[in-house]
From Swiss-Prot:
Matches recorded under InterPro entries: Ppandiol/glycerol_DeHydtase_su, Prodiol/glycerol_DeHase__sf_su
Mutant phenotype after disruption: A triple pduC-pduD-pduE deletion releases no acetaldehyde when grown on propanediol.
GO cellular component: propanediol degradation polyhedral organelle
Reactions it catalyzes: propane-1,2-diol = propanal + H2O
Cofactor(s) the record lists: adenosylcob(III)alamin
Family: Belongs to the diol/glycerol dehydratase small subunit family.
Protein name from the UniProt record: Propanediol dehydratase small subunit
Length: 173
């Protein structure tokens, strides 16, 4: 595939994402979580509100010491960020007028519920000529229904539409 074509396609997707940003569904709040909001004045969270920052295994920033790492009290699993922390970062970005960055944090928050292996499968499926439109739409439905990842599902549906327009689906090459 020609690099100019790839660059053009990426620019088109980004342009459409920017134009749809106001229409994109907001990330669903975490089940049982709080919908705390943060402002620019709360940044950086680690300094101003360390009590707000917890890992997926409920560890706090104070738990991350060299001693705890060396004694295996802190593992790689403990390093995973939570959707709540990502949503706080998104609200800070929105407050700062950085809507595109906020959208990225919200998408990342949704993806914390998706297993790593599934994310890699989706990544590969989104590469040009790897999937049919139906396969991409099935991925979008899966993201929305199984993982409540509405923003990511909309992104995959948009990609499916662009791939139809640009003839980048499986069998088009």
């Amino acid at each position: 595939m020609n690099t100019d074509a790839i660059e053009s396609m990426v620019r088109d997707v980004l342009s459409r994402m920017n134009s749809l940003q106001g229409d994109a569904p907001a990330a669903a709040p975490a089940a049982g979580g709080t919908s705390r909001s943060a402002k620019v004045s709360d940044y950086p969270l680690a300094n101003k509100h360390p009590e707000w920052v917890k890992t997926a295994t409920n560890k706090t920033l104070d738990d991350f010491t060299l001693e705890n790492v060396l004694s295996n009290k802190v593992t790689a699993q403990d390093m995973r960020i939570t959707p709540e922390t990502l949503r706080l970062q998104a609200s800070i970005a929105k407050d700062a007028g950085r809507d595109r960055l906020a959208m990225n944090f919200e998408r990342a928050a949704e993806l914390t519920a998706v297993p790593d292996d599934r994310i890699l499968e989706i990544y590969n499926a989104l590469r040009p000529y790897r999937s049919t439109k139906e396969e991409l739409l099935a991925i979008a439905d899966d993201l929305e229904n199984r993982y409540q990842a509405k923003i990511c599902a909309a992104f995959v549906r948009e990609a499916a539409g662009l791939y139809v327009e640009r003839k980048k689906l499986k069998g088009d090459d």
